[in-house]
Every structure is written in C-alpha cells, then in structure tokens.
Amino acid sequence: MHSKHPTDTARRCETGTDSSDTAADDYSLAGYRFELPEEQIAQHPPEHRGASRLFVMDRKSGVNTQASFKDIGSFLPEGALLVANNSRVLPARMLGRRPTGGKVEFLLLTPLPLVQPQTGTDGRSCAEAEGLLRASKRVRPGDVMHFDGLDVEVLHTADFGRCAVRMHWKGDLAGLFLRQGHLPLPPYIRRPDGEDDHSRYQTVYSRQDRLGSVAAPTAGLHFTPELTASLQEQGFGWAEVTLYVGYGTFSPVRAEDIRTHTMHREYMEITEQAAQAINDAKRQGRPVVTVGTTSTRVLEGAWAACGEIRPFTGWTDIFIYPGYRFNVADHIITNFHLPESSLLMMISAFAGREKTLQAYSQAVAAGYRFFSYGDAMLIL
C-alpha cells in the first residue's frame, strides 16, 4: 500500500490506547521535568564513533546496568531484528541577506524528495516548500531573501518563523545545499557546525538517496560498520526504514495537558523488503528492536494507519504518550531526551514515566552525556 495523504496515518495515540492504568501525572507536562547539569549536555561527539556508554534498563527485572555501547550485543535478545532509520541529514540551513542588507537564515523543512521543481519564466528552477526564516526584522509575504545560488520568496508566514516559500535556483538543488548549506545542529549545541559534524552527525548506514532530514536519528550515531557487521555475525537481523526527521523533533510540548498537544508530522517509508523482515521476525517470535524513536515512530505509525506492517509511503503525526500500547517495537535503543519533549513521552509510554525518570536520575548521577551527541540507552 502506498499512502500519500496525511489522513491515512494515525494522528494521535488513541489507537491501541488504554488509559485505565495511567496516572494523572502521566498527562501533566510538569511530570516530564528533570534536573540536568549544563555540562552533561554533549556539545561534541565522542572522540571515536561508538565510544559511548550504554545504560541498560530491564523493564521485567527492574535491574539497570551500566555498560559500553560496543558490548550491546551481549544484552540483546537472541535472534533479535534491529530496525534502523537510514535517512540522511541535509545541510539545510542557508545564511544570506535581505535586499536591505540585513542578515537572514533559512532552514528548508520540506523533505528534499518531496520538493517538486518546475521551470520558471526566468529559466531557473522553482518550487514551493515549507521553511523556517530567522531575520533581524519581521518577514512578510512578498519578501525575497537572497542566498548564494538560491532566492527564497515568502508566500505565507506562520508561528515561530515557519513560512511557505517559493525557492528559485539553477542546477541541482541537493548539490546546492550540499555545497552552501550548514548542518542544522540542535539548538542546545551552542556552537557553529564544523567539518567534523558533516560525518559525525550522520549514521554510517545513512543513504544518499534518503537525503532530507533536518536532524539525525541519533541513536544510530553509536553504530560503526564493524559493530553492525559483528551483530549480524552474532545472528541478529538488520532492517532499514526511512523517516525524514523534521525540525518539530526539537519543539517542546507546550500544553500543560499533554493530550492536547498538536504533534508535528513527518514523512516516512517502509519498503517491501523491510516489511517482510519485520513480519518474518514477528511470525517467528523474534524480538523487534527499534534503533531510535524515529524508527519506533515509523513502525507504530504504520501500524496505526494499516493495522499491520506492510510497504508504506506517507505521513505520520502519531503522538505516543503513556497509555499507548506498542504493537511492533519490543525493545528500543535510544539516546537521553530533553525534558518536556515528545520523545521523552514516547519513552515513558514504553518504560513507564516514573521508571524512566528514575533511570534518568541514575544516569545524571553517573555522569552520562545527554541528547544528540550523548550516550545511549537500551530498554529491554
């Protein structure tokens, strides 16, 4: 099945939800706050890829174990299938000038494969897209921003700098961003992107034909080619899905009752090969281990839309919070997430909010590094 309309995917987590055992605090935004020293927010990747710590949380036994990520194979259930997100981060942030000379930043939010170029009257390519504009003065419809090789015309404006725009350029758009663009590092990384980020803020299995995410699926950053090969030699399966990570992944939940939060949507794909691998694992009783919240969102979003895992292309805006019953993911590999974030709420739905926050407290006390370039967690 190929779904092309956002209504074909589940909007929220009501499908499969059972709130009878959910505490009131699970729905309160205040229930997702925790203290984190500033120095434990990782500003750089570890010196060597994969040299991360691993916090293993066993939901059944209640025992938490501290380990190294390179040893993750010794904790994974026998015969498990790992499902990873193979999308690649686009250097989607452009720096330029307004006609008046003022500085402006543009971040392309529309996944690159969904940009549909046409030929304009001036012979250049043009396409409408969604973006984020930051400028010293308010931008208005009709304004045109100039970047190196790219003109951006504002069509409509929305909250928090989001805009509908028409882009004008010559040649290959992907090549233009790859040459001139900057990686949109998360806002809590307080430095400009550097040369090292262009390799380290990508997973080793990301694909050039899946270029278009504005953030990395960070649980995958810990994997090296050697570790991936070793896991497959140990009998673990490997499948890949695609979710173009949107900037909404950094947006905090603002609603005091999280059930009223409007979740951002993201574009995803499950190939026939991946669907077959996942269904085979389920049929054979082999656990499915999702590599990150993005892979988890793909599988649970597809299940919410179709009632099964099958080839799928389309949008998901599923919001997973406590009370949700997981249908596909049996275990999750993930990083440590921001307070009050939808990602922390998803992990709390999987492992329990109080137990998750207790684990986070232990990780803080043990000096774990947090967020995108930080350490990892395996939830069994």
Curated annotation (Swiss-Prot):
InterPro entries: QueA, QueA_dom1, QueA_dom2, QueA_sf. It holds the Pfam family Queuosine_synth. Residues 1-24 are annotated as: Disordered. It is an enzyme of class 2 (transferase). The keyword Transferase applies. Its main location: cytoplasm. It catalyses: 7-aminomethyl-7-carbaguanosine(34) in tRNA + S-adenosyl-L-methionine = epoxyqueuosine(34) in tRNA + adenine + L-methionine + 2 H(+). GO terms for biological process: queuosine biosynthetic process; tRNA wobble guanine modification. Pathway: tRNA modification; tRNA-queuosine biosynthesis. GO terms for molecular function: S-adenosylmethionine:tRNA ribosyltransferase-isomerase activity. This is S-adenosylmethionine:tRNA ribosyltransferase-isomerase.
